[in-house]
Amino acid sequence: MIKIYDTMTRSLRKFVPLTENTVNMYVCGPTVYNYIHIGNARSAVAFDTIRRYFEYTGYQVNYISNFTDVDDKIIKAATQAGVSPKELSDRFIAAFIEDTKALGVKPATQNPRVMDYIAEIISFVESLIEKDFAYEADGDVYFRVEKSEHYAKLANKTLSELEVGASGRTDAETALKENPLDFALWKSAKAGEVSWDSPWGFGRPGWHIECSVMATEILGDTIDIHGGGADLEFPHHTNEIAQSEAKTGKTFANYWMHNGFVTVDNEKMSKSLGNFVTVHDMLQTVDGQVLRFFLATQQYRKPINFTEKAIHDAEINLKYLKNTLQQPLTETADEQELKQFVIAFQDAMDDDFNTANGITVVFDMAKWINSGSYTEPVKSAFEKMLAVFGIVFEEEVLEVDIEALIAKRQEARANRDFATADAIRDQLAAQGIKLLDTKDGVRWLRD
């Protein structure tokens, strides 16, 4: 039985899906104006692991993660680069996909983009105005926070506490607002900005409305799980709840999940502090699986400190697991012992996806395997556990198989069947085996 720590209730709750055997998840994706750093990647990896565990236990998962391709930061970066916002966002969407693929993140069921939902966003805003939850002011449209009952329920604070703690993350206070916490649903266009026509003039969506529209358009008025980084709890997720529930009159999400930060010297990794390393740069020297494994060593809600030693340890531990998988199979293994490992792994992951405890079970099982208990069922169970963490090792070609293929190639060459000989060379090359034809015969090496 899976239990989830729900930010809304500040408690562990048994997971009960809206539809049996199906999980509908929406996870806030990146604002695509630059390469993602390790801290950004944690959210992608954490929720991918959660998705994978749901699938491990038999659920079908509809996993939606958006790309914010309309934003002040994108407009600014595009202007500086001398390209259009779409060109810039396309470039960094491609980079995000490449980086997360290297981290073993599965493709989302859908990756909606804001630019594709402008008509739906305008319709959503019109509905809020009709219900008196929003008001137009000189081409801008704001959400009326004081009309929203229990506005701060996710943050578990009063309105006055939120005002003090917003730290510049709410819209800049203007004379047009009825309340400093009122937030923009639609922003009037400035000269030269990307914009769309609307009932309030040319403009573009506010940040928060985008996720509400894409989530409800794809998954419906109520979804099972909404996730994102802990920094999104307020104002982003707070505002998503307010506007979504104002429009539909229904609970927006049944479970709210937030991942912790990656820290450097115990301080949050962020672009503003300048203490970040991009995934793109890290992948030049560190294997993506190593980064992934490092991010899995702590339970998703806890902070994780980024150090060279932590990355080195992750690399060493991955090599150990890979070597374990390559052990020769044995004829027997204690079936009850195997069952206990599987139960222990599920107990760990059922407890709010506790990857740290899950990994402990994996290493205990590896020690057992290396003591001489490695049948085909054991190997299958072990590989499935590793796959939950996105760790999948490609099967290495055995030396005996390489030698057999080389002999077959030599025979083909002797028979002047060069097409077959070349095909075998290509087959081995695709598996990382390079052939060297010398006067003393054929030598081979792993590329």
From Swiss-Prot:
Protein's GO biological process: cysteinyl-tRNA aminoacylation
SUPFAM superfamilies on file: Anticodon-binding domain of a subclass of class I aminoacyl-tRNA synthetases, Nucleotidylyl transferase
Catalytic activity from the UniProt record: tRNA(Cys) + L-cysteine + ATP = L-cysteinyl-tRNA(Cys) + AMP + diphosphate
Subcellular location: Cytoplasm
Motif range ('HIGH' region): 30-40
Residues given in the record as Zn(2+) binding sites: C28, C211, H236, E240
EC number: 6.1.1.16
Subunit structure: Monomer.
Protein name (database record): Cysteine--tRNA ligase
EC primary class: ligase
Organism ancestry: Bacteria, Bacillati, Bacillota, Bacilli, Lactobacillales
One Gene Ontology term of the molecular function aspect: ATP binding
Superkingdom field: Bacteria
InterPro entries: Cys-tRNA-ligase (IPR015803), Cys-tRNA-synt_Ia_DALR (IPR015273), Cys-tRNA/MSH_ligase (IPR024909), CysS_C (IPR056411), Rossmann-like_a/b/a_fold (IPR014729), tRNA-synt_1_cat_dom (IPR032678), tRNAsynth_Ia_anticodon-bd (IPR009080)
Cofactor binding, per record: Binds 1 zinc ion per subunit.
